[in-house]
Regions:
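Non-catalytic macromolecular-recognition regions in eukaryotic signaling proteins
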Residues: 1-140
Length: 140
């Protein structure tokens, strides 16, 4: 399998339509849930999923970095469809899951330009989670 690096790419025509799996729209926030990340052509954000000792079907802590400098955790709004997908991934005993990441329904988002975000998922032993699937690719 390949290393799973889930990319979040904003409004790229190549990723339309986003209403079909495995694509979801999400709104990305940092710090307090009312503090919105400013997205522009000069931003360079990436996020790493931090393994949790135990997790149910809710996402695990993730941290966001800008130019390798940690900012804070990521927050998303809930979306049943995405929670189900995360639950399916959690059925894999080697997947750590997520505990603070949920997605907002795509129809609630404005049509804005976003920068590219990269997520890396890790196994419980700290190694990169691998799969042959692009199952959880997310589109802002």
């Amino acid at each position: 399998g390949k290393a799973v690096i889930y990319e979040i790419i904003g409004n790229d025509p190549a990723f339309v339509p986003v209403n079909e799996l495995p694509y979801y729209q999400a709104e990305l926030w940092v710090g307090l849930e009312t503090e919105r990340i400013t997205k522009n052509a000069n931003s360079n954000y990436s996020a790493l999923a931090m393994p949790a000792p135990e997790c149910d079907y809710r996402p695990d802590s993730m941290q966001i970095f800008r130019n390798n400098t940690e900012i804070t955790h990521l927050f998303f709004m809930d979306n049943l469809e995405v929670n189900e997908a995360i639950g399916a991934l959690n059925n894999n005993e080697f997947f750590t899951g997520f505990c603070e990441i949920v997605l907002k329904p795509k129809d609630a988002l404005a049509n804005n330009q976003f920068s590219k975000y990269t997520f890396k998922l890790f196994n419980k032993d700290g190694s990169i989670f691998e799969t042959t699937s692009d199952f959880l690719k997310i589109t802002l």
